[in-house]
């Protein structure tokens, strides 16, 4: 009986001891408290800096998960709440050789010397810097490398919605065989440095996604992103900003992806070899990565069609006026064109104002048309234009055999384009470029008028030629020829025909086929580049 009681008492004491140890493994610095001694992490534990709490001392490894080889701590968690501070000398958080380290920062993690977070030979670390969080060091802020003869340095994940920066070196620095890293800079996240070194450097088989800002504040001629290993993927998304070149050196198997949205122009200075992909379907070219977002041939085809229909409607209205020698009309229109991803048709709003004038001369009618307007594309791109066209209109309503209408007009459109592109060559990550060019147009058509219930029908053709021109920066365009051929059916019905008023109801069916150049050929700097099909 005494033996059983002794065993029972021993089990109770062991359980109490286990509970005490488990509870004691978690630690914190409370709000309003400043701790000036080093904090040694415990395995499977959480160390928390509460809001208003501070851990600060002129010490290396002020938060320590590694003391010596074989004496590292695994699966530890460090949480810094908003308003909390960790401030040390070098390696503010020492995560060397740790497995499963988690750091969640909403406050400040600072190293007055080198490395705010040291991840040498670490596996599976996760660093989350939340909005408002700051991680910085005088040299490199977050570092991982695989030391010679050390453990694998692999599987690190960094998610940044706050600010991470290095003053004299880099914000994020992976090298020496660090593999399988994932770096995600979210919208609102900022990664920057103030030196000639790369802002972010990744090594091998890693992924970098930027939806925020990566900024080399020393100069855009320095590297914003550097790659020192093979088989990496970089994705630049949304309205992300990159300042500094993309440098792949002599590495291989790297992919550079863009997802800025359909119609967004960009120009990124790169060095090294990349496979380029635009995930929105924009044309992208090799060399220094560029995409035009300038408006495809289909856009010109549509504008030609709108002009042709406008002229045909004008002639129909003129025919309804009996024995009118001279006549004119003004018009204002607004068109909203939705995007179409499959054929890269861009979304735009078209607002224009025009005047059509006609004057009878012997057996023909002289026509002159003026038009001005703005084509406002998505992604900060607009084109202002002014057009003048002139020609003849030949109605043959008195011809008993054919009763045909014919017209032909030619004109010129002066265009002033302005668009904002994303680029890593300026300190803002953006650049406004402009262009002045002209387009020459011809519109012609023939219509068979039917007096019975059979609808009128006809053929119309339009053609435009845009000579070669240069934008103010980076892009040079070769000449482009675009035309279309339309088969149309139309009719109108006179519902009211009194001395004082008339009311017509009409309809038009227009079937159009585009012809001419379907690809845009352009040059970046001095190297001619042809877009992918």
Predicted regions and their residues:
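Intrinsically disordered, low-complexity segments enriched in Gly and acidic/Ser/Thr residues
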Residues: 495-532
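Long, low-complexity, polar and repeat-rich extracellular regions
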Residues: 1-371, 383, 390
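A general structural signal for well-ordered alpha-helical packing
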Residues: 443, 484-490, 504-509
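Short secondary-structure junction motifs
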Residues: 195, 454, 500-502
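Outer membrane beta-barrel translocator domains of Type V secretion systems
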Residues: 299-477, 488, 493-497, 517, ...
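Basic side chains
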Residues: 2-3, 448, 480, 512-513
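Extended, low-hydrophobicity acidic Ser/Pro/Thr-rich
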Residues: 477-483
